[in-house]
Amino acid sequence: MKGGKRVQTARPNRINGEIRAQEVRLTGLEGEQLGIVSLREALEKAEEAGVDLVEISPNAEPPVCRIMDYGKFLYEKSKSSKEQKKKQKVIQVKEIKFRPGTDEGDYQVKLRSLIRFLEEGDKAKITLRFRGREMAHQQIGMEVLNRVKDDLQELAVVESFPTKIEGRQMIMVLAPKKKQ
């Protein structure tokens, strides 16, 4: 639908004519304090500078207003929030499955994967699954988990270590050590 009415989105800050207070505490373009002035005087100063008068904290007594370019202010705000989102890392739990009879070659490949996960800052979940008669040899499973724990002790801390078997599997969770 072309040419329709555009819905005005609510701004987080009131600007220029939207400010309702009679007197405001005014801050200049460079952040300098200009004192408490009337709203009309503040609007005139903003117009002289060719920018907007923006209400920063409406709940203060009197409300704090700043002379600034509102478009630039919104751009800087969104840019900084995007930067913050980039810096946040979602910690994932990566799972590697072992068996009591996992051979040396397979063990080394899985160990390299675990090292990569921990270096990337992710947690690692080691699942040791027993099948058939392997259930009778649970100590072999514990030896495998202890070996993994010992091999990764410089990189990781054990978050949970199995004390008993759950169903047909044992689960150990490793978290990466904090970097100094």
From Swiss-Prot:
| Gene Ontology MF terms in the entry | ribosome binding; RNA binding; translation initiation factor activity
Q: Which Pfam families does this entry report, sorted A to Z? A: IF3_C, IF3_N
- Transmembrane ranges, per UniProt, are none
What's the protein name?
Translation initiation factor IF-3
| Lipid metabolism as UniProt keyword | no
Keywords assigned: Cleavage on pair of basic residues, Cytoplasm, Initiation factor, Methylation, Phosphoprotein, Protein biosynthesis, RNA-binding
Q: What does this protein do?
A: One of the essential components for the initiation of protein synthesis. IF-3 binds to the 30S ribosomal subunit and shifts the equilibrium between 70S ribosomes and their 50S and 30S subunits in favor of the free subunits, thus enhancing the availability of 30S subunits on which protein synthesis initiation begins.
